[in-house]
Amino acid sequence: MDHLPMPKFGPLAGLRVVFSGIEIAGPFAGQMFAEWGAEVIWIENVAWADTIRVQPNYPQLSRRNLHALSLNIFKDEGREAFLKLMETTDIFIEASKGPAFARRGITDEVLWQHNPKLVIAHLSGFGQYGTEEYTNLPAYNTIAQAFSGYLIQNGDVDQPMPAFPYTADYFSGLTATTAALAALHKVRETGKGESIDIAMYEVMLRMGQYFMMDYFNGGEMCPRMSKGKDPYYAGCGLYKCADGYIVMELVGITQIEECFKDIGLAHLLGTPEIPEGTQLIHRIECPYGPLVEEKLDAWLAAHTIAEVKERFAELNIACAKVLTVPELESNPQYVARESITQWQTMDGRTCKGPNIMPKFKNNPGQIWRGMPSHGMDTAAILKNIGYSENDIQELVSKGLAKVED
């Protein structure tokens, strides 16, 4: 197979990934592949572009490094072109409502007839099967959080709150990426393709597991946090200093001992409630939990963030300032690791945003292209799989494909 024009880089160079999906979750999976060197083809509707394009800046990050194909994959010759593309594809990712592709005749079995080694990742809110009530429902970030038990655990004591920005979308997209790579590893061993059913609510169920396990195995439900503090453990979570906010984790025997000396609670060490060797102070079960919070709040409020960070570094207590977005760019760690970078958009502008992560030492990722326009690479992709200029024009004339104007 000849690949589309692009630089060769990253651990996934030579891999062809195709995705069909809008907004965040499914495309985020494709984005990870693209930043790690795979050739990634983004399928868009012919008549209506991906709704993400209405955003002014985010698409330049979320659709960089992609090849844009505008094709009606469910109808007539458009479907034929899509299936021909699948013959040269390693991984196909689709994000839709339940078994939408199967309902329209593109089943796993049809895809495997054209490519027995194909890895297929289906990403939906509620999965490919289940009850009629849920399976075909639309889902976004907040829907998956609400249905999974994740949302109810977040917020404050007075009200639950979703975790933003769009946590379920990103977790689900990354799950699709890792699952597809796991499947590809097995396919290369057996020669037999795989189909993956990723339900967003199940991803968030797994991500929300920490406190749920106490309920499933004892009936105890953890309360929601209060003012950003850990619902279980004192000295953990969000705290206010004299000039801003920090997060901290008071964990460890010596850390607790030394911190208690600073905040005037050394006399509690070695008591039945806080015996020697205590590594965590339970906010509820320990009768001194509220007192620890009161003393810690007072001590932190009397010190600046810089003073707290310096002292906690001496005590080996993990803490960090809560950075504002304007502070990120100039932070020395960000600068040293080039965590924020710039790249050129297709129309020649400069765009600034997060760099590629993680950092591969021997085969690093690369930003080689900004977001392509709607249908920008349709002709090149169709030619790559054997279509002539006349074939392409016929698809366009029938409204089954769109090429760049």
Curated annotation (Swiss-Prot):
It comes from the Bacteria. The keyword Transferase applies. One of its GO terms (biological process) is carnitine metabolic process. InterPro entries: CoA-transferase_III (IPR050509), CoA-Trfase_CaiB (IPR023452), CoA-Trfase_fam_III (IPR003673), CoA-Trfase_III_dom3_sf (IPR044855), CoA-Trfase_III_dom_1_sf (IPR023606). It catalyses: crotonobetainyl-CoA + (R)-carnitine = crotonobetaine + (R)-carnitinyl-CoA; 4-(trimethylamino)butanoyl-CoA + (R)-carnitine = (R)-carnitinyl-CoA + 4-(trimethylamino)butanoate. One of its GO terms (molecular function) is L-carnitine CoA-transferase activity. It is an enzyme of class 2 (transferase). Keywords: Cytoplasm, Transferase. Gene3D superfamilies: Crotonobetainyl-coa:carnitine coa-transferase, domain 1 (3.40.50.10540), formyl-coa transferase, domain 3 (3.30.1540.10). Its EC number is 2.8.3.21. SUPFAM superfamilies: CoA-transferase family III (CaiB/BaiF). The keyword Cell wall biogenesis/degradation does not apply. CoA binds at residues 97, 104. It is found in: Cytoplasm. One of its GO terms (cellular component) is cytoplasm. Pathway: Amine and polyamine metabolism; carnitine metabolism. Homodimer. Belongs to the CoA-transferase III family. CaiB subfamily. Catalyzes the reversible transfer of the CoA moiety from gamma-butyrobetainyl-CoA to L-carnitine to generate L-carnitinyl-CoA and gamma-butyrobetaine. Is also able to catalyze the reversible transfer of the CoA moiety from gamma-butyrobetainyl-CoA or L-carnitinyl-CoA to crotonobetaine to generate crotonobetainyl-CoA. HAMAP family: CaiB. This is L-carnitine CoA-transferase. It comes from Escherichia coli (strain 55989 / EAEC). The lineage of its organism: Bacteria, Pseudomonadati, Pseudomonadota, Gammaproteobacteria, Enterobacterales.
